[in-house]
Amino acid sequence: MEAEIVNVRPQLGFIQRMVPALLPVLLVSVGYIDPGKWVANIEGGARFGYDLVAITLLFNFAAILCQYVAARISVVTGKHLAQICNEEYDKWTCMFLGIQAEFSAILLDLTMVVGVAHALNLLFGVELSTGVFLAAMDAFLFPVFASFLENGMANTVSIYSAGLVLLLYVSGVLLSQSEIPLSMNGVLTRLNGESAFALMGLLGASIVPHNFYIHSYFAGESTSSSDVDKSSLCQDHLFAIFGVFSGLSLVNYVLMNAAANVFHSTGLVVLTFHDALSLMEQVFMSPLIPVVFLMLLFFSSQITALAWAFGGEVVLHDFLKIEIPAWLHRATIRILAVAPALYCVWTSGADGIYQLLIFTQVLVAMMLPCSVIPLFRIASSRQIMGVHKIPQVGEFLALTTFLGFLGLNVVFVVEMVFGSSDWAGGLRWNTVMGTSIQYTTLLVSSCASLCLILWLAATPLKSASNRAEAQIWNMDAQNALSYPSVQEEEIERTETRRNEDESIVRLESRVKDQLDTTSVTSSVYDLPENILMTDQEIRSSPPEERELDVKYSTSQVSSLKEDSDVKEQSVLQSTVVNEVSDKDLIVETKMAKIEPMSPVEKIVSMENNSKFIEKDVEGVSWETEEATKAAPTSNFTVGSDGPPSFRSLSGEGGSGTGSLSRLQGLGRAARRHLSAILDEFWGHLYDFHGQLVAEARAKKLDQLFGTDQKSASSMKADSFGKDISSGYCMSPTAKGMDSQMTSSLYDSLKQQRTPGSIDSLYGLQRGSSPSPLVNRMQMLGAYGNTTNNNNAYELSERRYSSLRAPSSSEGWEHQQPATVHGYQMKSYVDNLAKERLEALQSRGEIPTSRSMALGTLSYTQQLALALKQKSQNGLTPGPAPGFENFAGSRSISRQSERSYYGVPSSGNTDTVGAAVANEKKYSSMPDISGLSMSARNMHLPNNKSGYWDPSSGGGGYGASYGRLSNESSLYSNLGSRVGVPSTYDDISQSRGGYRDAYSLPQSATTGTGSLWSRQPFEQFGVAERNGAVGEELRNRSNPINIDNNASSNVDAEAKLLQSFRHCILKLIKLEGSEWLFGQSDGVDEELIDRVAAREKFIYEAEAREINQVGHMGEPLISSVPNCGDGCVWRADLIVSFGVWCIHRVLDLSLMESRPELWGKYTYVLNRLQGVIDPAFSKLRTPMTPCFCLQIPASHQRASPTSANGMLPPAAKPAKGKCTTAVTLLDLIKDVEMAISCRKGRTGTAAGDVAFPKGKENLASVLKRYKRRLSNKPVGMNQDGPGSRKNVTAYGSLG
C-alpha cells in the first residue's frame, strides 16, 4: 500500500487562489458573447419592455448554480462530468447525452458563423453567403495552428484571449453608458403563452448545456495540483463564477433596457439583424461598432472552438465512444453549423437570419432539463461526492431550478401545439421561410426532450442502486448468519438427541479399551519457579492443529450457533433457604437472554471430518515428542508475527508501519470475522449510539458498569452473613490469597512426592464404570497432552482449580468433577441413583420394602434417605488408621463436592432429614450430592465391586456413606471467618476422623492458610451462595426460590462473564489471532491477553483430550472461574475488554485500506462508545492477574525453530502503562491522518464511491470519540494496587 507524501506549503494569497478558479470560467463565459444571446435579449426587451428583467435575473442565478455545480463535481471527485456520467449511466443513456451536448455545440457555432458573416457584410459589404463561407474557413485555420502548439501553450493563449475579450466586452458596454437606467415599470405577473417564446429564448441565451462539460473538464485540470482543501476550492470557484456571470448579466440587462427604451416604448418591432446592430451602435455610442463587433465575434468564435476542441474530446470519448482527431471534430461541427446558415441565407435573407438566431436559443433551452438531471443527481449523491455533496439548501435550489426549466418547457410546448398566441400561429403558418421547418423541428425536439427527461428521471445512478442492493444483500446475509432458522435448530437438536446414546456407548467402549491396554507410569509433577511469567504465553498450534483451527475459524460464523431454545441454561445458583412463604417462590419458566451465548456452545460437528481428527491426533503425538526435546524455558509469546502467510522476511517483531498483512497478521476474512464477533458481543450490551440496550438495562447491567461497581467489589470482603443476603458466598481464604501466593508456599509445593504418597485428592485412576455420566465427567477434567493416557496427570493445574499439589509417581488419572450442562443431565443422575439403590438393595444394606415405600420420590431423594438410614444404623466406620490428617481450612464449597475422602465417624444426622425435607430450587443442575461418593469410589485402584472394600486392595477403607451426617457440624461456623483460622481446624485436630483421608505435605510457612480455593463446581456465579447442607437434596424440577434483588447483579455478572468467555474463544480461533493478544500495550490490554492465553490453553487441552477418546458431540464450556477476593473475573474485566477492543480496532483502522472493513470497524466503534464512560470517566484501579490466569510452565510450549536459523523475534515486554484518554486521542489522530491519505483508483466504484463514504463514516465516529474522550480527564490509577509501581502478589510471581 503506497503512502502519499503531503507537502505543507505556505498559505496562498487571494489572487493565487483565484486564478485556478477563474481560468475555467473565462473559457466558458466567452461562449456567451455571440449574436444569438444579443438577439434574444433585444427581442425580449423590444416586445415586453421591463417585464422580463426579473426573470432574466433568475435565469442568470440558475446559470451560476449550474456552472458552480459542474465545477464542484470536478473539484471534489477529481473527474469531469462526462466521465462520471459514463460510469453512472448505461450505454444508450450516455449516447443520448453525448448527442445532446454535440447538438448544443453546433447551435452555438451556428450563431458564431452567422454573426461573423454579418460583421463582414457591414465592414466590407460582402454578401451574406460569401461571409458565411469566409467565417467557415477560419475554423480550419486556428485549430490547425493550435495543433502545432503544445497543449499548455494553446490553453494559455486561449485563456488570456478569453479574458481580454470578456474584459473589453463588459467594460465597453458599461463604460460607454453615461448612466445605466435602472427603471423597471413592472415585472411579469403571469406566465402566459405570449411570453413563453421570449422566455425560452432568454433561457437558452443564459445557460448553455454543453458548457457544463467544458467547465467541469477545465476546473478539474486547473485545480488537480492544488494543495488547498476541497471546500476552499469550491468557494473560490463559486466566487469566480458569480463575478464573471454577474458581468455578463449586466451586459444582458443593458441590452434589454436599451431595446425596451428604443423599440418597446415607441411601438417598433425588430424584424432584421441590422435593426439589432443599429441598437448596438446606440449602446456602444461609437462609430467603430462594426470593427469592435467583428473582432469580438472572431476571437470569441476561435476561443470557443478551441475550448470545445479540448473539452469536447471527453464527450466524444466518454459518451459516444468515438476516437477522432480534434481538428476533424472541429471541422465536422463547423460544417454542420454552416449548412443551415447557408440554407437560411439563400431562402430568407437577413430577416430569416434574425429568426434563425432566436430559434437556436429556443432549441438550446429545450435541452436544459435533460442536461441538469445528471448534473444535480451527481452533485447530491453522497456515494459520489461524499461529505462534499451539495447541502440541503443547494438540493432545494437545484430541484426548484429543474422544475422551473421543466415547467417553462411544458408551457411552451402546450402553447406551440394548442395555443393561439401570435408566435405560435407564426410558427405553424410560417411564410417567411416558405415552409414549416421551424415548427416541425421544435415539435420533434420538444418530444425528444420530454422523453429523455422521463428516461433520465426513471434511471437511478449505478452507485446509488448498487449500494442499495449491497445493503439489502448484506442485511440478508447478516440475518442468515446471525439468526439461524427454527427449523435448522430443531433438526440439529433432534440429531443431537438421537445420536446421544450411540455416542455415549462408543465413548464408553473406547475409554474402556484404552484403559485396559494402557500401562500406568509415573510422571514428574513440577511447578514452575514463577507461576505467572510476563513474557511467557502459549505458542501457536502445530501445523496439524492449526489446520483444524482454520477449519473452525472459517466456519465459525455459520457453525457457532446458539442453543437458546434448549432450556435456556442459567447460571447454577443455590441460596440460603430459611423459612420463606409461598409468595417468595418465583417460578422462572424461561431465562431471558442477556447474551447470545449459552453455556453449551455448538461447534461444527466433526463426525464426518475424520481426516481432521486423524491429523490432529498425529499432531498431538508430534507435539508430545517435540515437548520432550524442547527446553521448558524457551517460551513463545502470543505476540508472534501471525500465520506464515503474513510474516515478513526480515523477522522483526513488534508492530511497525509496514504493510497491513505484515503488521496485523490477520487476513481479510479474519478481520471481517473479528469485527463480526465484536459487533455481536457488544451488540447485546450497547446500541450504535453507545447506550445500553433495553434488554441489558432490564437485567441491571448498567449497575455493573456504573456506581454499583464499588459495591460489587466491596461485597466480596464482607462477612459470610452479609454475603449470603447479597447472593454471594465469599471464600474464607480469599482474604489471604496474597499470602498464599508467596514463594515459600510454592517452594513447599514444588517438592517431589514419595512413592507411597498420593498425588492429590483428585488423583484417582479412571475405572470402568457402567454409568455414562462418569465417563462424561472424566472428560471434563483431563487436560493431558499425551496420546497414550500414561501421562495425563502431568498437568500442574486443573481447569480453574487453584490447588497446587505435588506430583504423583503413581500416575493416577484426574477425576476432578466439572459443571456439566445439558438437558440430558436429569436422566443421567436418575440412572446413577437407580443403579446405586439397586446395588444397595442387592447387598442387603437397604430393605427393599423400605426403598419401595418411598413412593413418588425421585431416585436421588431415595438414595439420600438410604444413606441417612445407613448412617443412623451405625454402618459408617471410623477413621482409617495409619494416615496423617491434614488440618487446613477450606473454602466454602458445595456440600456435594467437599472432602468426601475424609472418612468421618458417625455423628449427628439431624440435618439430613431437614435436607431431604427441603426441595431443590433450581433447574439448571440436578442434585448429585448423594452420588458423588459412589461415583468417585467406583474408580479407586483395584476396585472390583465399585466400592471401597478392604478385601479389594483399596487401602482398608470401608464404605463412607455417613459423610453427609456430619457435614453440618463441620461447616456450621464457617460463615463468620474470612481469612482467619477455621473452626474446622480445631475440630479436625481434636477429631481425627474429620481429617482428609489423603494427606498432603504441608509447609511450615503456610500456617493455617488453606491450599484450596474454589474448584469449578465452586465457581463464581455457579454455586457461591450455599448455606444449607440439605440444599442439594431438593428436587431439581421444583421452581427457583431466590431473592431477585439480592442475586440479580451476581447472576447478570456471571452470565456476562460467561458470554465474554465465549467471545474470547471465538477470537482465539481466528487465524492470526496471535497478533491480537500479543501487543501488551497497556494494563487492560495485557490482562485481556493473559485471559486469552489461558482460554487458548484450556481449549487446546480439551481438543487434544477429545481427539484421543473420540468426539463427544458438543464441547463443554465450564462456568466462570473465581479464585478469591483478588480474582479478575468480575465486571471490571468487561471494561478492560472494552478498552482492549477500542485499542485493537483503532490499530487495525490505522493501517486498513479497505472501505468495506472501515464500515465494519465503524459499527464496532459506535457500540464501544458505551465503554468510554466506565473506563475513563472515573478513577479506576487496574486489576492484577490472579491464579485463574496461570499457565503451568510444564505446558508452556517451546518456540518453533526459525526457518533461516535465526532466533525468533523477542517477546514484546509489557509496558505496564494504562491506556488513558490521551493515549486514545493520539491514536485517533494518527488514524485520521492515515485514512485521509487513502485513495482508491480513479474511475472505479471503489475509488469514487466506497472510499469517500468509508472515510466519512469512520471520520464521523472518530470525531465523536475525540469529543467524548477530551472530556475525560480522569483515567486509571497507575499507582493503585494493580500498578506496576507497587509490588503485589502478581508482581512478585511474574
Swiss-Prot record:
Consequence of gene disruption: Complete ethylene insensitivity. Extreme salt sensitivity during seed germination and plant growth leading to epinastic backward growth of leaf blade and petiole, and small rosette size. Reduced ethylene-induced histone acetylation of H3K14 and H3K23 associated with a lower induction of ethylene-responsive genes.
UniProt biased composition (Basic and acidic residues): 536-550
Keyword Cell membrane belongs to the record: no
Segments on the Cytoplasmic side according to the record's topology features: 1-12, 72-105, 149-155, 216-237, 309-334, 377-397, 462-1294
InterPro entries, per database record: EIN2, NRAMP_fam
Region (Disordered): 534-561, 623-662, 1269-1294
Keyword list, A-Z: Auxin signaling pathway, Chromatin regulator, Cytokinin signaling pathway, Cytoplasm, Endoplasmic reticulum, Ethylene signaling pathway, Membrane, Nucleus, Phosphoprotein, Plant defense, Stress response, Transmembrane, Transmembrane helix
Additional facts recorded: 'Oresara' means 'long living' in Korean.
NCBIfam families per record: Nramp_1
Family membership noted in the UniProt record: Belongs to the NRAMP (TC 2.A.55) family.
Stated role: Central factor in signaling pathways regulated by ethylene (ET) and involved in various processes including development, plant defense, senescence, nucleotide sugar flux, and tropisms. Necessary for ethylene-mediated gene regulation, and for the induction of some genes by ozone. Acts downstream of ET receptors, and upstream of ethylene regulated transcription factors. Required for cytokinin-mediated processes. Seems to be implicated in cross-talk between ET, jasmonate and other pathways. Probably not involved in iron uptake.
Name of the protein: Ethylene-insensitive protein 2
Species whose genome carries this gene: Arabidopsis thaliana
